[in-house]
Amino acid sequence: GEMWLRGDHYKWRCMRTFGIDEKYITGDASYYEKYMKFAEILPQLVGNPIYIWCALELKRYFDIDEPLTAANAQEIYDRTKKLITEKHMTRRWCMEHSNVRLVSTTEDPIDDLRYHKALNEEKMFTRVITAFRPDKAMFCANADFAAYLAKLSAAAEQPIDSFAEMLTALEKRLQYFQQITGTTVSDDGIPYFNWADYTPAEVEGIFAKARSGGKLTQHEIDQYQSAFLFEMARIYNRNHYVMQLHIGTYLDANTSHVKSVGQSTGFDCCDDAAPVKGVGELLNNLTTIGELPKTIIYPLDGTKIETWAILAAGFCDNGTKAKVQL
């Protein structure tokens, strides 16, 4: 039960859809009870990738061909529990037997990467790296922006009293990530993006205003985020990073439930706003100065894939296959 359901908010969403009480999803019920509740609704997920994945896992790891249902849930529970014990099926065992050669986590620039350091000291079949995710430094309108800058300052061991100093601190942390895990990828989440022209002086003023808790206009937010993504892309380029843009994130849609059970528990969605023009201007401005890094765009809205693919194809580069891709 724990192997299947702990932290798996995709399964949690399905269970909520079929009216399962939250007690059996994120609540204090035992993992055995949660597993039995999940078995009740799994047959109704035919057509959902989760149904296919569950069948694949039962076959691949336990050689079980029967579909899991409420009727055979106890029998399958007993069989799998016995095999898990006999084969010592740890997380590492599962990754190795699935021939997983590389896993990437995603971490904030302030993370000390202590667990990555520990993994580096062990000989593992699977290599573990991390993506560099600086979102909290981009969201200048957030109430905790100043507090986050203080944490970033401590992690980078330098003062941050300006936008320029913040960029220096982020680059130091990016290089630290590269040193510890060998990573060469970013992970930038963009719920909304509209390119807005700016001057360095304007951005410094916006930074100071945000840091002091001032209320920003939407235009100021657009200017700051334009400058942030532009300068971070330049940092990625000179450090040979691939820039990954997750576009259209709509987090915590059900705020009352998020307050009750926490973030990343199955209440994130995709927005239908496709800032193609804004991202296009970002890519164009980077191309103009010859500093566009390799870029992967992840549009969360599946209906806009064609639009994004056409944009990506417009930024080819001599000698580089699909420099911008989906």
What is the predicted function of each stretch?
Residues 1-239, 291-309, 313-326:
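Metal-cofactor-binding active-site regions of metalloenzymes
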